[in-house]
Curated annotation (Swiss-Prot):
Compositionally biased region (Polar residues): 1-21, 100-115, 658-676
SUPFAM superfamilies from the UniProt entry: GTPase activation domain, GAP (SSF48350)
Molecular function per GO: GTPase activator activity; SH3 domain binding
Protein name per Swiss-Prot or TrEMBL: Rho GTPase-activating protein 6
One term under GO cellular component: actin cytoskeleton
Annotated source species: Mus musculus
Residues with Phosphoserine modification: 37, 265, 365, 669, 675, 682, 713, 758, 776, 781, 790, 824, 941, 944
Keyword set, alphabetical order: Cytoplasm, GTPase activation, Phosphoprotein, SH3-binding
Subcellular locations according to the entry: Cytoplasm
Length: 987
């Protein structure tokens, strides 16, 4: 038999039928049953034996053992065949690389540039090429350890492809092997590298510094809280000698019920003949929260259906109204609010929330933060990030990959929050609250209403003692106590430690609790602390004596201690035998709960050292996650070393059009829904590199001074990524402003930049050289008469920003042009700037236009020629009162800067001074200062002084005339006389 026929029989999809096929198939089935649960090495050995027997049978080999036939039976013949060598060489010359460690003596070694790379390739699904490509790609899908370079093709094929558990007989096993392979090392993070400095400060390569501070545990993301559990568990084992075994508590829903509990619950259901399934009492805490959320979603859905039914007529008249409403709805960042936070809230019919969008957990998962766009991430969030109870059923290895990067809502049951709110409002002055008896009938009625899932509104007519008894009964009936049975001994043994160590140990034990237990415990301790503060009698503001409730922290701990921390309930006989021991434990429980009530605020704060450990743990596995978390911490901090915030939204409460599908750093609300994508973060990091390299001191722009819209173009993005030292150099070639981006879309030949802003708040031209307090996306509109002598006015905390100005990142831009005003005049508000500028300049890119008000004029460049005279040659124009600059108008007539104050002002831009025109410029600047005092809503004449001289030099240039004409047309387009031309988001 020739080598060609053998290859055909091996790699074809169907083997030729022969008399021995049935016996081979039967034998293979028996072997498959025998070796299904054996070790892979035994399976490979069995397969090799079968391959040897199959080689003796020749062409009658079955499809299951055909690779062993090639490997064992006829390996020498195929190796000696020239045609087979040619075919094998052509196979290995395919562009799809194999594993870097695989090599055979008969084929040249092919190694990837990095030995740690693992390549995953899709298998072609053609009929003729499926098994061929599979056979030659087997080395790339092997999951076994060891060096593959020392293994022959026969052993490789027999261990992976020919055995009964190989990929040909078990595709599911092959997929699992591919699934558990290490992921491709294609994720590189060269754009930002964070490192810890040892004093809880993290620095990036871009120069950004973040100092960790104590934060509430609720402000941490879901992933951080999961890692915090591990860090606290490690510290408890290493540093705290509690004399007991410590385990991280599992979620109550995952714990199996004992047989006795099952029988007891079955008997109770039969005796009571309930017509409904309990929704609150006697259920795991996570399930109670899931039921509350499901009921809230059902209510929201019914409310939306009712609204849709009432608005069918309007929708039929306006077919696009519904689409527009949904679009606006999805573009806003809706904050997640738990049903337990606002139990009595009613959703406004004017602002509906889509149920799947508004009630998911957190933001994006870890495994999709770098390789999904926004549309895919929305789908991922809706599918993977479902209820907290469902997330616990995942494997522990894949747990972190499904956790959110943003803080999740408070997981507090609706019943607990409703009772606490009612008692805080009506029961703080009730003497003996939680001790006075209640009506069992009314308490049972309230319990049934909550168990049915009814949205119970606890009003003033409800008795305070009934509500207090309901709260105690809920905590007592929980199948697992709030402080969990796993940590029962650990909590009690904290009293054996030194007093200064007890609080820190209690803090670590609280970190071990599941998020639902931790949040519910925080809400309960907060309420009990408020009750304890009203225990003593005091005098009100009116001078009347207010009686206290007499419930001190000790009394409250005596009541709630056994409900929060207890062992599994035992029989009466066991209780009588161990009564003395239980009494001692009860005293310890009361002492522990009392300490927690008195120090609840400190217990739920996460110190910087633990945050640092969490970030170090995440840095080893997910550096991109650490980058996102640290940038969010930086944006939320109020330190002046942060350049800008990462999110922009309007002052009026309406979100920007970029907020729906761009990065959000979590500073809109702690329950933000969006997470960044890798491409955006890399651009942001490059922008930070540029900004930090060029300015000596960085400033933070408050969120309330952020522009609504943005401008986007490839040219502006390329400028954003340019290096920082350019900020101190000549900037006529590469201006860092938005007007240059606009002009690049109109005329690519001109390089003269301008400025954009919000509603015309352009106070200076971006053609001026950058100042120490300038930002990369646009200069702050400053009231310079107020900060004339202080170059660090921004840093000192006295914000002199008059109007909103853009400080948002360029990568978070919308596709439309949302600039509301474009002003070609550098609206410098005092004469001091005019005095700093010479009367004539030879730099064509420092041109300042001679326009006192472009909003009213309708002439073209000829009008500019008629106005090209200095101010001192046109004294009659100083009294004009028919023109006003575009808003924002200059300041309220404070004294302008005089020439005596000029040495105090820093050099704000590069100038080419001329000796012959300096004195004239000073005189004109002083005259402009006087006019600014008398007419605060007029433009200063200092612009006309320097700009008119510049006009005389540039009027002969055709390109400059075209540039002025384009500026004039854009200003007319966006003037107040034509408000319809403004973008929708800025009207």
């Amino acid at each position: 038999m020739s080598a060609q026929s053998l290859l055909h029989s091996v790699f074809s999809c169907s083997s030729p039928a022969s008399g021995g096929t049935a016996s081979a198939k039967g034998f293979s089935k028996r072997k498959l049953r025998q070796t299904r649960s054996l070790d892979p090495a035994l399976i490979g050995g069995c397969g090799s034996e079968m391959g040897a027997e199959g080689g003796l049978r020749g062409s009658t080999v079955s499809r299951l053992h055909s690779p062993q036939l090639l490997a064992e039976g006829l390996g020498s013949r195929l190796a000696s065949s020239p045609r087979s060598q040619h075919l094998r060489a052509t196979r290995f010359q395919t562009p799809r690389p194999l594993c870097s460690s695989f090599s055979t003596p008969s084929t040249p070694q092919e190694k990837s540039p990095s030995g740690s790379f693992h390549f995953d390739y899709e298998v072609p699904l053609s009929r003729s090429g499926l098994k061929k490509s599979m056979a030659w790609d087997l080395p790339s899908v092997l999951a076994g350890s060891g060096s593959a370079s020392s293994r022959s093709p026969a052993s490789i094929l027999s261990s992976s492809g020919g055995g009964p558990n190989g990929i040909f007989s078990s595709p599911r096993r092959w997929l699992q092997q591919r699934k558990f392979q290490p992921p491709p090392n294609s994720r590189s993070h060269p754009y930002v590298v964070w490192r810890s400095e040892g004093d809880f400060t993290w620095n990036s390569m871009s120069g950004r510094s973040v100092r960790l501070r104590s934060v509430p545990i609720q402000s941490l993301s879901e992933l951080e809280r999961a890692r915090l559990q591990e860090v606290a568990f490690y510290q408890l084992q290493q540093d705290c000698d509690l004399g007991c075994q410590i385990t991280i508590p599992k979620d109550g829903q995952k714990r199996k019920k004992s047989l006795r509990k099952k029988l007891d619950s079955l008997g109770k259901e039969k005796n009571k003949d309930k017509e409904f399934i309990p929704q609150a009492f006697g259920m795991p805490l996570s399930q109670v929260i899931a039921n509350d959320r499901a009921y809230k979603l059902k209510q929201d859905l019914q409310r939306e259906e009712q609204k849709d039914a009432s608005s069918d007529f309007v929708s039929s008249l306006l077919p696009f109204g519904n689409k527009k409403q949904n679009k606006e709805l999805s573009s806003s960042n809706s904050s997640l609010s738990s049903t337990s936070e606002t139990p009595n809230e009613s959703t406004s019919p004017n602002t509906p929330e889509p149920a799947p969008r508004a009630r998911r957990r957190g933001a994006m998962s870890v495994d999709s933060i770098t390789d999904l766009d926004d549309n895919q991430s929305r789908l991922l969030e809706a599918l993977q990030l479902s209820l907290p109870a469902e997330a616990q059923s995942k494997k522990e290895k894949a747990r972190d990959k499904k956790l959110s990067l943003n803080p999740i809502y408070r997981q507090v049951p609706r019943l607990v929050d409703s009772c606490c709110q009612h008692l805080e409002k009506h029961g703080l002055q009730t003497v003996g609250i939680f001790r006075v008896g209640s009506s069992k009938k009314r308490v049972r009625q309230l319990r049934e209403e909550f168990d049915r899932g009814v949205d119970v509104c606890l009003e003033e007519e409800h008795s305070v003692h009934d509500v207090a008894a309901l709260l105690k009964e809920f905590l007592r009936d929980m199948p697992d106590p709030l402080l969990t049975r796993e940590l029962y001994t650990a909590f009690i043994n904290t009293l054996l430690l030194e007093p200064e160590e007890q609080l820190g140990t209690l803090q670590l034990l609280i970190y071990l609790l599941p998020p639902c237990n931790c949040d519910t415990l925080h809400r309960l301790l907060q309420f009990l602390s408020i009750v304890a503060r009203h225990a003593d009698d005091n005098v009100s503001k009116d001078g009347q004596e207010v009686t206290g409730n007499k419930m001190t922290s000790l009394n409250l701990a005596t009541i709630f201690g056994p409900n929060l921390l207890h062992k599994q309930k035992s029989s009466d006989k066991e209780y009588s035998v161990q009564s003395s021991a239980r009494a001692e434990e009860s005293t310890a429980i009361i002492a522990v709960v009392q300490k927690m009530i008195e120090n609840y605020e400190a217990l739920f704060m996460v110190p910087p050292d633990l945050q640092n450990e969490v970030l170090i743990s995440l840095l080893e596995t997910d550096p991109d996650v650490v980058d996102y978390l640290l940038r969010r911490k930086a944006s939320q901090s109020s330190s002046p070393d942060i350049l800008q915030t990462e999110v922009s939204f309007s002052m009026g409460g309406r979100h920007s059009s970029t907020d729906s599908n761009k990065a959000s750093s979590g500073d809109i609300s702690p329950y933000d829904n969006n997470s960044p994508v890798l491409s955006e973060r890399s651009l942001l990091a490059m922008q930070e590199d540029r900004a930090r390299g060029g300015s000596e001191k960085l400033y933070k722009v408050p969120e309330q001074y952020t522009l609504v819209g943005h401008l986007s173009s490839p040219k502006s993005k390329s400028r954003e990524s340019s290096p920082g030292p350019r900020l101190g150099k000549e900037m006529s070639e590469e201006p860092f402003n938005i007007w240059g981006t606009w002009h690049s879309t109109l005329k690519s030949g001109s390089k003269d930049p301008g400025m954009t802003g919000s509603y015309g708040d352009i106070f200076e031209s971006s053609s001026l050289r950058p100042r120490p307090c300038s930002l990369s996306q646009g200069n702050l509109s400053l009231n310079w008469p107020r900060c004339q002598g202080s170059p660090t006015g921004l840093d000192s905390g006295t914000q002199v920003i008059r109007r909103t100005q853009t400080a948002a990142t360029v990568e978070q831009c919308s596709v439309h042009l949302p600039v509301s005003r474009v002003c070609s005049t550098p609206h410098i508000q005092d004469g001091s700037r005019g005095t700093r500028r010479p009367a004539a300049s030879s730099d064509p890119f420092l041109s300042l236009n001679s326009t006192e008000d472009l909003a009213e004029g309708k002439e073209d460049v000829a009008w500019l020629q008629s106005q090209a005279r200095p101010v001192y040659q046109r004294p009659q124009e100083s009294g004009k009162d028919d023109r006003r600059p575009p808003p924002p108008y200059p300041g309220s007539g404070k004294p302008a800067t005089t020439s005596a104050q000029l040495p105090l002002e820093p050099p704000l831009w590069r100038l080419q001074r001329h000796e012959e025109g300096s004195e004239t410029a000073v005189e004109g600047g002083q005259q402009a200062s006087g006019e600014h005092q008398t007419r605060p809503k007029k433009l200063s004449s200092a612009y006309s002084l320097s700009a008119s001289e510049q006009d005389k030099q540039n009027l002969g240039e055709a390109s400059w005339l075209d540039w002025q004409r384009e500026r004039w047309q854009i200003w007319e387009l966006l003037s107040t006389d034509n408000p319809d031309a403004l973008p929708e988001t800025l009207v």
